[in-house]
């Protein structure tokens, strides 16, 4: 409505009325609208800009807060990772030390067992040799005694034969 109303007096002193000249009315109307907007709109636009600025600043603060939280979580995760790596390295080192100690202990036990088995083998061989020598000696002595007995029997009379037999029997009794 205001666009077509002009506050200019009419040429024929008719009073106030409708001005249909577009060039005159537009400039005046635009000036009035701009003045009204400048007076009323500054507070409104200023309020809108202030609200928008506060909203943007709040969003930036929230984003910065989330960024700081993410950075802190990353730092904590990196510290935990480093701690885990350190623990893993320590466990690996201890495992290697334990494995080496077990290997050395097993090697020592194996050497001791081999020495014990070698000693047992030597003892068994020696005992078997002694047993074989004793058996051979017993057989040789038995055969020699049988041969000597046959020789003596063939060359002796009965009295001599009894004395020799008694003597050998006494010797055998003393030995066994």
From Swiss-Prot:
Superkingdom assignment: Eukaryota
Any Pfam family the entry gives: ATP-synt_B
Entry's localization field: Plastid, Chloroplast thylakoid membrane
Membrane topology summary: Single-pass membrane protein
Keyword Phosphoprotein: no
Disulfide bonds listed in the record: none
Residue spans crossing the bilayer: 27-49
Any Gene Ontology CC annotation: proton-transporting ATP synthase complex
Role played: F(1)F(0) ATP synthase produces ATP from ADP in the presence of a proton or sodium gradient. F-type ATPases consist of two structural domains, F(1) containing the extramembraneous catalytic core and F(0) containing the membrane proton channel, linked together by a central stalk and a peripheral stalk. During catalysis, ATP synthesis in the catalytic domain of F(1) is coupled via a rotary mechanism of the central stalk subunits to proton translocation.
Record text on subunit structure and interactions: F-type ATPases have 2 components, F(1) - the catalytic core - and F(0) - the membrane proton channel. F(1) has five subunits: alpha(3), beta(3), gamma(1), delta(1), epsilon(1). F(0) has four main subunits: a(1), b(1), b'(1) and c(10-14). The alpha and beta chains form an alternating ring which encloses part of the gamma chain. F(1) is attached to F(0) by a central stalk formed by the gamma and epsilon chains, while a peripheral stalk is formed by the delta, b and b' chains.
Family from the record: Belongs to the ATPase B chain family.
Further information: In plastids the F-type ATPase is also known as CF(1)CF(0).
Protein name: ATP synthase subunit b, chloroplastic
Organism listed in the record: Nephroselmis olivacea
